[in-house]
């Protein structure tokens, strides 16, 4: 079996949706410009040698439809030779693509693949524009298959005894860690600056355009405090505990990695960043989908021949504080190594992009902490009752 390495990894900043800094930017544009930036960092790579562009997206319709990955390949590489395929496993789509790319290279089916994810929740809302439910399923007692994510977060909070106070504390800490990371410029090296053109009608009724560059995550709020979080009303259930403040933010963003065979890495004289050791997905009850990592993490560890204590750093997607805390407690995760720079409650959760985004963040933080030869993990819950986990060995 061949060895597959990740040689480059970049992401955009994450903007709030639907009225944030990227509301005037299409998803395919965000993705294409990220890939262009990455290609500029690889001048020795002939674009025609790239075998595929694999893009994760959770809501592939509207401006994200029509096999967006192929359009991203055409736009980002500016040649027709490289195909593209869009992949959807909801919130784990972005790391699912890295798993597919790695497996294809290991099997000898490819030598070089761009993998990642992109999502604009400003362009395509959660559940898409016109979901069509299977009412036979609903009428047969499976309405939880279609539960909104907030309802599942309430179910997790109730079943696993996660208090409102603990959820708000977790959310507060997420913002504090993210703000500290921003103040220390810990994200700067991983973020691709994106130019946005905003067209509007000025005071004289004339069409005008202004431009700005986005290179900083929009989500972390300096004014966040425990008192304000405690005053927020539950959003999903009367008397519930899940609020807008202890839930992830709707977001826009893109993130990509370049995966190469060992032979190509040596030929191009590149230094690999990391390798995907194992990726696993698992199923759980849809009504408590947030607990998905509790099944996915042990599965990934077992397949990799590793133990939980072998993991030095973890990026756990904070879909909700309730499910994040439930996962941490059920598995006994060391909170000192989980989301050291904050998570999705502060930094945002651009659905199909998130798995790739968290991978980029993981590599950069492991580099800063000089964790060569150690293992890191990216994990998340997934809608309709799934969990996913990817284990990486950091190299350089």
Question: How does the language model describe each region?
Answer:
Residues 1-27, 225-291, 295, 302, ...:
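Condensing-enzyme catalytic core mediating Claisen C-C bond formation in acyl metabolism
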Residues 11-12, 24, 28-33, 44, ...:
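N-terminal extracellular/periplasmic Venus flytrap/periplasmic-binding protein-like
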Residues 23-113, 118-135, 191-214, 287-288, ...:
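Conserved beta-ketoacyl condensing-enzyme motif
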Residues 25, 57-111, 132, 144-151, ...:
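Conserved catalytic cysteine-centered active-site region
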Residues 27-43, 68-72, 97, 149-156, ...:
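Short, well-ordered amphipathic alpha-helical segments that serve as non-catalytic structural scaffolds
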Residues 88-118, 157-186, 256-263, 328, ...:
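Active-site-proximal alpha-helical scaffold in enzymes
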Residues 152, 187-190, 277-346:
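Active-site pocket-lining segment
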